[in-house]
């Protein structure tokens, strides 16, 4: 079994980045922007309502406070401040989730914060503190072997490992930085093949060409890539044709 998640609600005001409604007909979990890197109150409410109608799980995609940089700029935020901001984002999304008749089911960091907590125990601890402040029962979604999942597990939080079909990997199992050539896999056929290999075999071909183990319960497809909806449909169809059950982890 594998969960399919995508980043949604990443518009702001009249500007829309992702085709939320169509993607929600394919994925099983939605990482909803909570206003710090993208998203606003109206967008958060609408995505929660659409997700609830389709039975899609809602996750809080928490970020550094960085609207101008889409949450992809490295920042040094004091741990206490970061913990408060993580809790704030979860709480804001929870209001709209409950109004739609559902709830926030998990938490996933975004962008620079996601990459930072792979190695930085202090920032990872701040994220975990923020999750515990909001709801200590919430699972944390992250990269296998990351400091985030280690700290979360020690703190008693449920953890869920995640893999990326459309991102390049280093041989160490981390993501190739977006600024490097080939960091994003754009060939649809390659993304589909990588998805099946990750779900069935627990492996992926690293940027170097070496095949590495990546065990994950959830597979992320980015909603802001060209042709994201059709690609997501192809991935899900191929997974199911390969005998993989696609269902939410939460």
Curated annotation (Swiss-Prot):
E.C. code: 3.5.2.9
Keyword Transferase: no
Coiled coil: none
Keyword annotations: ATP-binding, Hydrolase, Nucleotide-binding
Classification via InterPro entries: Glyco_hydro/deAcase_b/a-brl, LamB/YcsF/PxpA-like
Top-rank EC class of the record's enzyme: hydrolase
A biological-process GO annotation: carbohydrate metabolic process
Pfam family, one: LamB_YcsF
GO molecular function, a single term: ATP binding
Organism domain of life: Bacteria
Reaction it catalyzes: 5-oxo-L-proline + ATP + 2 H2O = L-glutamate + ADP + phosphate + H(+)
Quaternary state and interactors: Forms a complex composed of PxpA, PxpB and PxpC.
HAMAP family hit by this protein: PxpA
Role according to the record: Catalyzes the cleavage of 5-oxoproline to form L-glutamate coupled to the hydrolysis of ATP to ADP and inorganic phosphate.
Family per similarity comment: Belongs to the LamB/PxpA family.
Protein name, per record: 5-oxoprolinase subunit A
Organism: Streptomyces avermitilis (strain ATCC 31267 / DSM 46492 / JCM 5070 / NBRC 14893 / NCIMB 12804 / NRRL 8165 / MA-4680)
């Amino acid at each position: 079994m594998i969960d399919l998640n995508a980043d949604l609600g990443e518009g702001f005001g009249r500007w829309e980045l992702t085709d939320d409604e169509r993607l929600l007909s394919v994925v099983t979990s939605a990482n909803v922007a909570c206003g710090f890197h993208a998203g606003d109150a109206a967008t958060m409410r609408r995505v929660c309502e659409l997700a609830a109608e389709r039975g899609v799980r809602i996750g809080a995609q928490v970020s550094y406070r960085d609207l101008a940089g889409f949450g992809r700029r490295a920042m040094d935020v004091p741990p206490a401040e970061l913990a408060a901001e993580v809790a704030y984002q979860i709480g804001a999304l929870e209001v709209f989730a409950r109004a739609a008749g559902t709830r926030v089911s998990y938490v996933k960091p975004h962008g620079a914060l996601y990459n930072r907590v792979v190695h930085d125990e202090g920032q990872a601890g701040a994220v975990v503190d923020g999750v515990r402040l909001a709801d200590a029962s919430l699972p944390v979604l992250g990269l296998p072997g990351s400091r985030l999942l280690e700290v979360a597990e020690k703190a008693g939080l449920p953890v869920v490992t995640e893999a990326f079909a459309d991102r390049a990997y280093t041989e160490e199992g981390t993501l190739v930085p977006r600024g490097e050539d080939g960091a994003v896999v754009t060939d649809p056929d390659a993304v589909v093949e990588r998805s099946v290999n990750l779900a069935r075999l627990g492996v992926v071909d690293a940027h170097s060409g070496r095949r590495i183990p990546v065990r994950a319960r959830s597979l992320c497809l980015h909603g802001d890539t060209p042709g994201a909806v059709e690609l997501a449909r192809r991935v899900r169809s191929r997974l199911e044709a390969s005998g993989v059950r696609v269902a939410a982890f939460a």
